[in-house]
């Protein structure tokens, strides 16, 4: 695979290999055959970032080859959304011969939605001034004249200039209902929107017979907690990043959801609060004991759950675990499988043509 060529004819084979690999990894804990969810074979990534290479009068996107670190020129990127590909061409054309916009520009980040909105961030090794803003506004207007619904942001050390806004609103059809998700520039969002829809619908199906309340750790912008709210009486969710918490609060209102409470704190801190080890001012007015959480949802970073959180989640009858790293999932399962059985297993092909796998498990207490 090269950045400008996807081996789409090998899609089925690479997915089959992942299924075999996941089954092998999960064998000590379950003999279930994974439910498999396919990605679009191309144009599946909704975000991408590229370094910029200045070569005389020429200017182009590059990425670095992982092993050799050599530069690879990228004029098109079929893994990314069609809108990103359109913007890649339009941005180079708009910046190449503009001294103010081009000077010391070293990176461009693209964030797009299925609803055809985009935020493009230009990163610089220089101070940004009013002249930069004026030229950037002219470029933005030219892009919009090409029917590109785009917002531009300039970034430099300790500087961020938003011409309009630093977010876009994604609209996803999830099990017969449209979900609105505000996505903020430079914050985590699910990279593969089509796969995200399938993950949300799988999680909804896995929890459809649930009772009581849901607790979610690492909720981000509320991606899962808001979609799952329809299956539970109440949802209590934690997140540490301020922009994600703000986006989650917006998403609660935009989706007219009244049974979700977001708390800004780390999963480790929440574990301490639940266990009565520490009290936190930010939990004032929230009666943790009033929640009857029979299900806990975790979507941890690649490092998986820490040992204290492992112990905490074992107290719940049902654990829904989405993992972006099956190796750390299996490490966690060495502990969790002492009290819970794997009752559902899913493979989500979030990153086609790569070694990476995303998977989901539903664990039920013995």
Curated annotation (Swiss-Prot):
Cellular component aspect of the GO annotation: cytosol
Superkingdom assignment: Bacteria
Keyword Nucleotide-binding recorded: no
Catalytic activity: uridine(54) in tRNA + S-adenosyl-L-methionine = 5-methyluridine(54) in tRNA + S-adenosyl-L-homocysteine + H(+); uridine(341) in tmRNA + S-adenosyl-L-methionine = 5-methyluridine(341) in tmRNA + S-adenosyl-L-homocysteine + H(+)
Keyword Cell membrane among record annotations: no
GO BP terms in the entry: tRNA methylation
Enzyme class: transferase
Pfam families for the chain: tRNA_U5-meth_tr
Gene Ontology terms for molecular function: rRNA binding; tRNA (uracil(54)-C5)-methyltransferase activity, S-adenosyl methionine-dependent; tRNA binding
InterPro entries per the UniProt record, alphabetical: MeTrfase_TrmA_AS (IPR030390), MeTrfase_TrmA_CS (IPR030391), SAM-dependent_MTases_sf (IPR029063), TrmA_MeTrfase (IPR011869), U5_MeTrfase_fam (IPR010280)
CDD domains (alphabetical): AdoMet_MTases (cd02440)
EC number, UniProt record: 2.1.1.-, 2.1.1.35
Chain residues that bind S-adenosyl-L-methionine: 190, 218, 223, 239, 299
Catalytic residues in the record: 324 (nucleophile), 358 (proton acceptor)
Keywords in alphabetical order: Methyltransferase, S-adenosyl-L-methionine, Transferase, tRNA processing
Function: Dual-specificity methyltransferase that catalyzes the formation of 5-methyluridine at position 54 (m5U54) in all tRNAs, and that of position 341 (m5U341) in tmRNA (transfer-mRNA).
Family recorded in the similarity comment: Belongs to the class I-like SAM-binding methyltransferase superfamily. RNA M5U methyltransferase family. TrmA subfamily.
NCBIfam families for this protein: trmA_only
Protein's name in the database: tRNA/tmRNA (uracil-C(5))-methyltransferase
Species of the source: Citrobacter koseri (strain ATCC BAA-895 / CDC 4225-83 / SGSC4696)
Gene name per UniProt: trmA
């Amino acid at each position: 695979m090269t950045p400008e060529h996807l081996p789409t004819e090998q899609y089925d084979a690479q997915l089959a290999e992942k299924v075999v690999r996941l089954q092998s990894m999960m064998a000590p804990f379950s003999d279930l055959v994974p439910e498999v969810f396919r990605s679009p074979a191309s144009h599946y990534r909704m975000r991408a970032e590229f370094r910029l290479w200045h070569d005389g009068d020429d200017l182009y996107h590059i990425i670095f080859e992982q092993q050799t670190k050599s530069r690879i020129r990228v004029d098109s990127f079929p893994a990314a959304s069609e809108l990103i590909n359109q913007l890649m061409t339009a941005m180079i054309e708009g910046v190449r011969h503009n001294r103010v916009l081009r000077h010391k520009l070293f990176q461009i980040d693209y964030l797009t939605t299925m609803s055809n909105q985009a935020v493009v961030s230009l990163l610089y090794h220089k101070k940004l001034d009013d002249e930069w803003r004026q030229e950037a506004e002219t470029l933005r207007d030219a892009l919009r004249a090409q029917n590109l619904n785009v917002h531009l942001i300039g970034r430099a050390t300790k500087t961020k200039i938003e011409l309009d806004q630093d977010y876009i609103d994604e609209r996803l059809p999830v099990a017969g209902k449209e979900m609105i998700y505000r996505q903020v520039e430079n914050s985590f969002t699910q990279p593969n929107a089509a796969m995200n829809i399938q993950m949300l619908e799988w999680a909804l199906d896995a929890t459809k017979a649930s009772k009581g309340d849901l607790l979610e750790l690492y909720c981000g912008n509320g991606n899962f907690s808001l979609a799952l709210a329809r299956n539970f009486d109440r949802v209590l969710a934690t997140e540490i990043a301020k922009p994600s918490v703000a986006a989650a609060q917006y998403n609660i209102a935009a989706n007219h959801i009244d049974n979700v409470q977001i708390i800004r704190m780390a999963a480790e801190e929440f574990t301490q609060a639940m266990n009565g080890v520490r009290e936190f001012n930010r939990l004032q007015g929230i009666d943790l004991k009033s929640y009857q959480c029979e299900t806990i949802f975790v979507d941890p970073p690649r490092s998986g759950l820490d040992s204290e959180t492992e112990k905490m989640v074992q107290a719940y009858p049902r654990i829904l675990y989405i993992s972006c790293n099956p190796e750390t999932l299996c490490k966690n399962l060495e502990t969790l499988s002492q009290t819970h059985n794997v009752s559902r297993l899913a493979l989500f092909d979030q990153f086609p043509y790569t070694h990476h796998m995303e998977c989901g498990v539903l664990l039920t207490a013995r």
